[in-house]
């Protein structure tokens, strides 16, 4: 739902207020009829004292609460009456105060124009210093008053909405009170409380009605106060600067006098040493003069930075007040845009830290030299002894005078250096405060502007005002055009333009040579002996250089147009540099996908895919150019983004083109390109979905009025696209380098094998006992393993780099999310060490919780693949261990993610543990078997008596363990059927694990031979059959035994061992077949029970054998 915000005319506002007030008064008739006199505070306090003497009970507590509430309401009435009287007084004196403020403003403007420092020059330095201190105090008072005036002015901007809300709330409250007063059963004390409450509401209604009625007058009054204080602040700052300049000039004059005095003394001296000392004093005086000038410069910088700091502090207060008063309105958006433009930039003075360190060292050294001059006799004696000179009394006196002057000059120098040090430290701290406050203001403005509507929603009203808005924008664009008025720099600019054309032409002249070099590289990469890892980087560099000529020509033409046809060429020049950079990138990018370009020759893609990508990129360039130049339209009007209807139309058209034309083509290209690379399918899916949904979402934002938000996101998406393109190019270049290295390694190994084979052939032709043939050495690592390990290592850094790049691109919007902390969803009490506090759960907490749940879901779904790539593929683990680790980590991630998400929403473990305890007890009785199976599953995962892949037998069911779940274990029996067995059966029942600690099992083959057979031969044949089977272990070795005399057989057993359970069936089959073959070859009969059937004739006694005739 879109709510239109508009300013209600004062007439209708006052009419609405009068109606609300009349309604509230009419509904208060019952209260007026009940009594005409309200109780006094003294009478209520007396009643309260009498009530406290009553016996304890509910009636006493209720009566005390009613009386105390009545007393509080009376006090609120008194406070409200004072507020009403103050408002009335302000209104009655508003006209005179406005005239007075305007007159004072005119006087201050005249004072500002005619300000002079002549009078200050005649004052002493102490007097000027005291005046400066007083002015600084006055400046602080003016800043505080200005803050108050600004708060009043900002609050007046939203007085209509706040007064209407208060009147509406009072009407509802009045209706509720009147309904209570209509009930005759309420007590007299409660009735008096309601009557007092009605009186308070009446005063509040009167106050709000007065505010609405005199809204314009109060706005004029507060604006005049603000203008006066603001101008007064400027005058005071100007006076401070003027006085500080006079102080600096006096300091400078004093230093100059000392220099002149030293120079005068030099003219009358004949002694060489004294002349040298005079020269040193003159140099010291000159140095003192330089340091005084530096101190004066630092003073001006410190004063300027302090004024900026005060201005920023005032701006911060103003922004906070405006945000509080105009939350969610279009007016706030326009104010934010204005404040952004007013923020200072590039104000910091560089090198202050080094200057402070140098000053401290310098002060220390000069102080040491000055301390030597306190004992002049000792200093002169030292000079006489070192230089071998003897001063006369007059010369000694003159030297003392010089040293005394030097000591004074040194003290002045130290004072100046200390002043510089203090100013530099103060300036550095001020700069730090300016940076912090500026960053805070910038962050707050970014937060507000991102989440606040910047334009009117696109609806029917927007369509109606579209023609007029378009005309205004086109007129604004025409105002930007014009011929230059100053041609002083024209010769230099022409030389600059000519230089760009010449460089571009030189590159264009070598175009054929560059193409020949590229063709040469393309031919070399198809041969193993000429291919190199540097072939692709060199080809990329040549391609970028080849596309540079058109970029330079484009830049030259754009800057010429900006100079000759725009009133402010600098704005157009900034745009031309930016567009030239994009031009170079996209011409380079599109040249990679030529039929014989790098994408085909170096990255081994098909020409059809290259052509498809080229077509998509050409269309993307159109969209990017349209979106990048949207800001041009917003700069031609005074309102900026607020009235940028042309930019809105342009942006929506570009996004529609992206969603309707580019997205389907891009998806088709990705589907055709996907078979060429079998990695990162999930990333391709995300890109495909994003290309469809992002333009639609941005269009919705623009339609709803969040035009600035959409432009901000568009800019970040474009930068992300460019960053991804560069990353993709680097990634494929590195991959190709690894491929080239792998091919060379394979070639070297093949050559080594051939050489080794040739040596072996030579050895075979040499018959000598001294020659020992050495077999081929085993390869340490397969080529595929080398390449896969390199790719995994590179992927780790490449994907980390991509995440870092994306964070850099989107980092400025991270602070925007903190705005969600101000949107409270619910509140709850929390007990801490400091006591019970109220904790607010905001929309930011909900967003963080959703992110945690999403990350947890992604980890749980992909933990098996991640562990396989990072750990399991590099470490040899026993059977079932990877499954156990994966399952346990899944449970851990779910528990941590769930607990973290709940804690983010204010539901900590201390609050949930009792719920979980109660649920555990309740569910433990109701779902005992399920809990038993759950605990049994945890035991099985930790003790690991069975593992995935083990062959087990339980309850006469045999099969292979396929899954170990929370409740049950899935077995795959030998008929390929899934058997679900509860976990509890494996813990409490008897289980046979055929491969728990050792997969070796024994096979027993029973054979019965006929009586009379050669038993030794039978034993040999059984062992021979066992030895011939490769799956039978030699340790323990096979054994054959003659066990029993059967009814018709001599029973033997062949006992062998196999390494794996899966070899049992195949080994049994092979042994039985081989034993049958060997016994048949050696005429050994396998005895069996034989039944002969005879048909007997009872009459004749003849017996006829029954023979089965096979047909």
Curated annotation (Swiss-Prot):
Its main location: membrane. GO terms for cellular component: plasma membrane. PANTHER family: MECHANOSENSITIVE CHANNEL MSCK (PTHR30347:SF1), POTASSIUM CHANNEL RELATED (PTHR30347). The chain crosses the membrane at residues 490-510, 538-558, 572-592, 620-640, 644-664, 694-714, 797-817, 840-860, 885-905, 922-942, 1003-1023. Keywords: Cell membrane, Membrane, Signal, Transmembrane, Transmembrane helix. Disulfide bonds: none annotated. One of its GO terms (molecular function) is mechanosensitive monoatomic ion channel activity. It is a multi-pass membrane protein. It holds the Pfam family MscS_porin. Belongs to the MscS (TC 1.A.23) family. It is found in: Cell membrane. Residues 1-31 form the signal peptide. It comes from the Bacteria. GO terms for biological process: intracellular water homeostasis. This is Uncharacterized MscS family protein HI_0195.1.
């Amino acid at each position: 739902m879109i709510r239109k915000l508009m300013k209600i005319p004062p007439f209708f506002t006052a009419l609405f207020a009068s109606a609300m007030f009349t309604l509230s008064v009419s509904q208060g008739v019952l209260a007026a009829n009940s009594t005409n006199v309200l109780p006094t505070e003294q009478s209520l306090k007396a009643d309260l004292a009498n009530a406290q003497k009553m016996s304890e009970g509910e009636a006493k507590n209720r009566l005390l609460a009613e009386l105390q509430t009545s007393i509080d309401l009376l006090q609120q009435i008194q406070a409200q009456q004072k507020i009403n009287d103050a408002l009335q007084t302000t209104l009655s004196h508003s006209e005179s105060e406005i005239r007075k403020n305007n007159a004072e403003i005119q006087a201050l403007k005249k004072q500002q124009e005619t300000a002079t420092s002549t009078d200050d020059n005649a004052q002493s330095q102490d007097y000027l210093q005291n005046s400066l201190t007083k002015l600084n105090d006055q400046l602080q008072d003016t800043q505080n008053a200005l803050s108050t005036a600004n708060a009043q002015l900002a609050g007046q901007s939203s007085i209509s909405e706040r007064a209407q809300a208060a009147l509406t709330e009072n009407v509802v409250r009045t209706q509720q009170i009147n309904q209570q007063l209509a009930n005759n059963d309420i007590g007299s004390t409660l009735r008096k409380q309601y009557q007092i409450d009605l009186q308070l509401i009446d005063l509040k209604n009167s106050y709000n009605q007065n505010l609405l009625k005199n809204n314009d007058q109060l706005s004029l009054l507060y604006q005049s106060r603000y203008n006066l204080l603001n101008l007064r602040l400027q005058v005071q700052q100007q006076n401070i600067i003027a006085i500080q300049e006079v102080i600096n000039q006096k300091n400078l004059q004093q230093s100059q006098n000392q220099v002149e005095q030293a120079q005068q003394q030099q003219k009358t001296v004949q002694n060489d040493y004294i002349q040298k000392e005079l020269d040193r004093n003159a140099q010291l005086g000159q140095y003192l003069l330089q340091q005084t000038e530096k101190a004066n410069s630092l003073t001006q910088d410190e004063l300027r930075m302090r004024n900026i700091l005060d201005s920023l502090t005032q701006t911060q207060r103003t922004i906070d007040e405006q945000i509080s008063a105009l939350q969610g309105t279009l007016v706030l958006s326009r104010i934010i845009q204005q404040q952004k433009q007013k923020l200072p930039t590039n104000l910091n003075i560089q090198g202050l830290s080094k200057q402070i360190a140098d000053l401290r060292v310098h002060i220390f050294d000069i102080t040491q030299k000055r301390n030597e001059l306190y004992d002049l006799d000792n200093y002169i004696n030292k000079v006489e002894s070192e230089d071998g000179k003897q001063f006369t009394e007059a010369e000694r006196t003159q030297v003392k005078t010089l040293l005394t002057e030097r000591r004074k000059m040194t003290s002045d120098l130290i004072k100046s250096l200390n002043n510089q040090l203090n100013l530099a430290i103060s300036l550095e701290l001020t700069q730090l405060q300016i940076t912090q406050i500026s960053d805070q203001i910038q962050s707050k403005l970014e937060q507000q502007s991102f989440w606040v509507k910047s334009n009117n929603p696109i609806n029917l009203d927007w369509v109606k005002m579209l023609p007029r808005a378009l005309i205004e924008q086109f007129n604004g664009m025409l105002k930007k055009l014009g011929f230059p008025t100053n041609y002083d720099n024209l010769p230099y600019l022409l030389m600059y333009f000519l230089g760009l054309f010449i460089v571009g032409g030189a590159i264009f002249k070598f175009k054929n040579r560059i193409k020949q070099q590229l063709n040469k590289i393309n031919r070399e990469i198809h041969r193993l002996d000429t291919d190199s890892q540097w072939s692709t980087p060199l080809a990329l560099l040549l391609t970028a250089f080849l596309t540079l000529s058109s970029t330079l020509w484009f830049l030259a033409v754009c800057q010429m147009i900006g100079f000759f046809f725009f009133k402010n060429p600098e704005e157009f020049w900034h745009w031309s540099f930016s567009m030239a950079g994009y031009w170079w990138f996209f011409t380079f990018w599109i040249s990679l996908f030529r039929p014989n370009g790098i994408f085909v020759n170096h990255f081994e893609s098909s020409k059809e895919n290259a052509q498809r990508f080229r077509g998509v990129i050409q269309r993307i360039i159109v969209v990017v150019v349209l979106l990048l130049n949207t800001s041009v339209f917003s700069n031609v009007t005074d309102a900026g983004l607020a009235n940028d209807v042309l930019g809105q139309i342009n942006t929506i058209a570009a996004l529609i083109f992206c969603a309707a034309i580019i997205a389907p083509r891009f998806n088709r290209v990705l589907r055709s390109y996907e078979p060429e690379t079998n990695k990162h399918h999930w990333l391709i899916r995300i890109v495909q979905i994003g290309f469809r949904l992002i333009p639609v979402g941005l269009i919705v934002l623009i339609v709803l009025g969040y035009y600035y938000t959409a432009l901000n996101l568009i800019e970040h998406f474009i930068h992300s696209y460019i960053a991804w393109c560069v990353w993709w190019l680097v990634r494929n270049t590195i991959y190709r380098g690894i491929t080239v290295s792998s091919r060379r390694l394979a070639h070297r190994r093949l050559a080594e094998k051939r050489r080794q084979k040739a040596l072996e052939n030579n050895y075979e032709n040499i018959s000598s006992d001294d020659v020992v043939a050495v077999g081929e050495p085993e390869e340490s690592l397969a080529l595929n393993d080398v390449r896969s390990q390199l790719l995994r290592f590179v992927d780790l850094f490449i994907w980390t780099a991509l995440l870092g790049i994306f964070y850099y691109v989107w980092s400025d919007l991270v602070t925007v999310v903190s705005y969600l902390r101000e949107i409270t969803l619910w509140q709850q009490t929390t007990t801490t060490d400091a006591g019970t506090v109220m904790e607010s759960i905001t929309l930011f907490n909900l967003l963080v919780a959703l992110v945690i749940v999403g990350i947890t879901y992604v980890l749980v779904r992909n933990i098996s693949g991640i562990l396989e790539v990072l750990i399991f593929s590099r470490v040899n683990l026993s059977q079932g261990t990877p499954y156990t680790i994966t399952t346990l980590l899944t449970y851990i991630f779910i528990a941590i993610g769930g607990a973290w998400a709940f804690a983010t929403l204010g539901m900590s473990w201390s609050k949930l543990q009792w719920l979980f305890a109660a649920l555990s007890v309740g569910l433990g009785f109701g779902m005992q078997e399920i809990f038993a199976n759950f605990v049994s599953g945890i035991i099985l995962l930790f003790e690991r008596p069975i593992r995935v892949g083990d062959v087990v037998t339980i309850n006469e069911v045999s099969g292979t363990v396929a899954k170990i779940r929370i409740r049950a274990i899935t077995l795959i029996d030998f008929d390929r059927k899934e058997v679900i067995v509860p976990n509890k059966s494996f813990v409490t029942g008897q289980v046979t694990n055929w491969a728990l600690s050792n997969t070796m099992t024994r096979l027993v083959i029973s054979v019965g031979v006929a009586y009379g057979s050669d038993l030794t031969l039978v034993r040999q044949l059984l062992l021979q059959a066992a030895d011939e089977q490769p799956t039978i272990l030699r340790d323990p070795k096979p054994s054959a035994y003659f066990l029993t005399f059967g009814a018709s057989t001599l029973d033997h057993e062949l006992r062998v061992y196999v390494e794996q359970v899966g070899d049992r069936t195949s080994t049994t089959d092979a042994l039985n077949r081989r034993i049958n073959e060997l016994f048949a070859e050696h005429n050994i009969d396998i005895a069996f029970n034989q039944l002969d059937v005879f048909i007997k004739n009872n009459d004749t006694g003849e017996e006829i054998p029954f023979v089965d005739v096979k047909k």
